[in-house]
């Protein structure tokens, strides 16, 4: 046993210090990034935000809607090959370039993903997703995927520390997914006692990944557009959002009615709801590590997407970053004990 005594920080522990700016307007800020990935060699340009691969967020409808904002969607792994074929038949090449194909690590997952990728060469992203990216089996699967799909851009996770981030990149991942327990419907930290404050995880993993020519995506912990800006400021190349994109017309959650008001169900992918839906039950040897919540319907996702992108542009103007690419080097975090004046929050 050992104790690390240096301070670890989440998004709520900091604010970004404003700096002198020469920008005249938020409209002057360029949010598009251009990347060339380490292993695949593929080049990509777009807004580096990703809708999470949850079946109540990462839907085909979400992918179609967010593509118009140049935002990626990690489509959840529970669609069949036939459903993928129908989606591809009805989608433009521009939509498909904003899609990530998600997979687990079983042999069946591998074969299904292979079939999906064979449907259309425009599918260039693979998202290999498990709750615990520290297992040897996971690293081996990433290496297997890299060998099988040498020109596909592979995103793999989740981890929260530099040494594991490096191992995944050396095994073939182009992008490492960072985050254990910060999600809005994740209960891993209270069920297991395991986790890592998200901002510190991003800072540590970004440093490790960039040293090897890899990239990271901050996955979880964002509740406001300001948190998205903090993740980018901390060094994230991409930011993945779940709860902030849930409850919309495109989110795919089941709608329930209570006292005449309609709500949409949103649940974590290790929750009892998810396991009952996709596996049939919660296995005897495990506990659910997610929860289910009812969200008021939030309408089309386009309004939320504009709000997020608007907040991100504004953050850049406050620190004098004319491009999102510059936000990290223009960011100075200050530790705080308050984020906002909450006097009217309950009205």
UniProtKB/Swiss-Prot annotation:
K(+) binds at residues 181, 183. The active site is at 186 (thioimidate intermediate). NADP(+) binds at residues 108-131, 216-239. One of its GO terms (biological process) is purine nucleotide metabolic process. Catalyzes the irreversible NADPH-dependent deamination of GMP to IMP. It functions in the conversion of nucleobase, nucleoside and nucleotide derivatives of G to A nucleotides, and in maintaining the intracellular balance of A and G nucleotides. Keywords: Metal-binding, NADP, Oxidoreductase, Potassium. GO terms for cellular component: cytosol; GMP reductase complex. Disulfide bonds: none annotated. Coiled coil: none annotated. This is GMP reductase. Homotetramer. It is an enzyme of class 1 (oxidoreductase). The lineage of its organism: Bacteria, Pseudomonadati, Pseudomonadota, Gammaproteobacteria, Enterobacterales. It catalyses: IMP + NH4(+) + NADP(+) = GMP + NADPH + 2 H(+).
């Amino acid at each position: 046993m050992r104790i690390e005594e240096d301070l670890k920080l989440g998004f709520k522990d900091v604010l970004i210090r404003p700096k002198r700016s020469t920008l005249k307007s938020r409209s002057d800020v360029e949010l598009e990034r251009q990347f060339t990935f380490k292993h695949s060699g593929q080049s990509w340009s777009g807004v580096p935000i990703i809708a999470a691969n949850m079946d109540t967020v990462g839907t085909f409808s979400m992918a179609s809607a967010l593509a118009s904002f140049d935002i990626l969607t990690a489509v959840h792994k529970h669609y069949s090959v036939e459903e993928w074929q129908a989606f591809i038949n009805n989608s433009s090449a521009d939509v498909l370039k904003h899609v990530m194909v998600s997979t687990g690590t079983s042999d069946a997952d591998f074969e299904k993903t292979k079939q999906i990728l064979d449907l259309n060469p425009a599918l260039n992203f693979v998202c290999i997703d498990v709750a615990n990216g520290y297992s040897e089996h996971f690293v081996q699967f990433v290496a297997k995927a890299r060998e099988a799909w040498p020109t596909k851009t592979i995103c793999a996770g989740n981890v929260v520390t530099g040494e594991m981030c490096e191992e995944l990149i050396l095994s073939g991942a182009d992008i490492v997914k960072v985050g254990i327990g910060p999600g809005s419907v994740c209960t891993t930290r209270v069920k297991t006692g395991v986790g890592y404050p998200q901002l510190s995880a991003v800072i540590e993993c970004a440093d490790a990944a960039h040293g090897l020519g890899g990239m990271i995506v901050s996955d979880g912990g964002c509740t406001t557009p300001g948190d998205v800006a903090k993740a980018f400021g901390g060094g994230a190349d991409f930011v993945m959002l779940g709860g902030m994109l849930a409850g919309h017309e495109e989110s795919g959650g089941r709608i329930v009615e209570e006292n005449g008001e309609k709500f949409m169900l949103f649940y974590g992918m290790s929750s009892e709801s998810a396991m009952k839906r996709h596996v049939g039950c919660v296995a005897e040897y495990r506990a659910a590590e997610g929860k289910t919540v009812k969200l008021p319907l939030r309408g089309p996702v386009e309004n939320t997407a504009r709000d997020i992108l608007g907040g991100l542009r504004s953050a850049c103007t406050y620190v004098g970053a004319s491009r999102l690419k510059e936000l990290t080097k223009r960011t100075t975090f200050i530790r705080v004990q308050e984020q906002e004046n909450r006097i009217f929050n309950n009205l």
